[in-house]
Amino acid sequence: MAKRGKKYLEALKLIDKEKTYSLDEAIQKLKEVEKILQRKFDETVELIFRLGVDPKYADQMVRGSVVLPHGLGRELKVLVIASGEKLKEAEEAGADYAGGEEIINKIANENWIDFDIVIATPDMMPKLAKLGKILGPRGLMPNPKVGTVTTDVKRAVTEAKKGRVEFKVDKTGNLHVPVGKISFEDHKLKENILAVVDAVLKAKPPGAKGQYIRNVVLKTTMSPSVKLNPAELQKALETKAA
């Protein structure tokens, strides 16, 4: 195990590992930890779920996307693969790159991946198949389940630019979702987090048995984890919706 620095150990004392915190308390704890750690970069805040699913079964796969109300805190580069009028639509919506087979060949031949999200029209998907080994492992392959295979290119690009994030449970039942930057105001982080919780709840698969959300923690890139109370999160969602 890597040796922890003095600042990290000092920050660790702020968090009670046996306690589950309310969302407001957890955000405050992370802000206090950040003051101690004094990182030289604006750390990403991440929500990590432990789900009661076994994703090796198709009816227990958890996958989806959500538009964060306040974005991720960084500009995402969007690539659209389409043809004809859809290319013009993509450019007008603000896509960073837009093209057809020439873009596909560039990725295949040059291993070019200077983008964060790939959106494709359905007619281009057969041609994209050869990019599976390049885009797949990086989570960049377009998928209709998360809205990146669509004929509504304008909407997809607009949502991506606003801060749409995709999520997919890993083989161990864990789900990692970025929710913003530590520099965000508390209420913005909270609203982003609740949007993610809502999306994950709505993505509950039909084969899930027993407790769906078993554990949730909030952390930054380099900080210790802060445990959240799943029941309190759902209550906060209900309060927001009321």
Curated annotation (Swiss-Prot):
Domain of life: Bacteria
A single GO molecular function term of this UniProt record: rRNA binding
Keywords: Repressor, Ribonucleoprotein, Ribosomal protein, RNA-binding, rRNA-binding, Translation regulation, tRNA-binding
GO cellular component: large ribosomal subunit
InterPro entries cross-referenced by the UniProt entry: Ribosom_uL1_bac-type (IPR005878), Ribosomal_uL1 (IPR002143), Ribosomal_uL1-like (IPR023674), Ribosomal_uL1/biogenesis (IPR028364), Ribosomal_uL1_3-a/b-sand (IPR016095), Ribosomal_uL1_CS (IPR023673)
SS bond partners: none
GO annotation (BP), single: regulation of translation
Signal peptide start and end residues: none
Record HAMAP family: Ribosomal_uL1_B
Quaternary assembly: Part of the 50S ribosomal subunit.
Function: Binds directly to 23S rRNA. The L1 stalk is quite mobile in the ribosome, and is involved in E site tRNA release.
Family: Belongs to the universal ribosomal protein uL1 family.
Name recorded for this polypeptide: Large ribosomal subunit protein uL1
Taxonomic source organism: Sulfurihydrogenibium sp. (strain YO3AOP1)
Biological classification of the source: Bacteria, Pseudomonadati, Aquificota, Aquificia, Aquificales
Gene: rplA
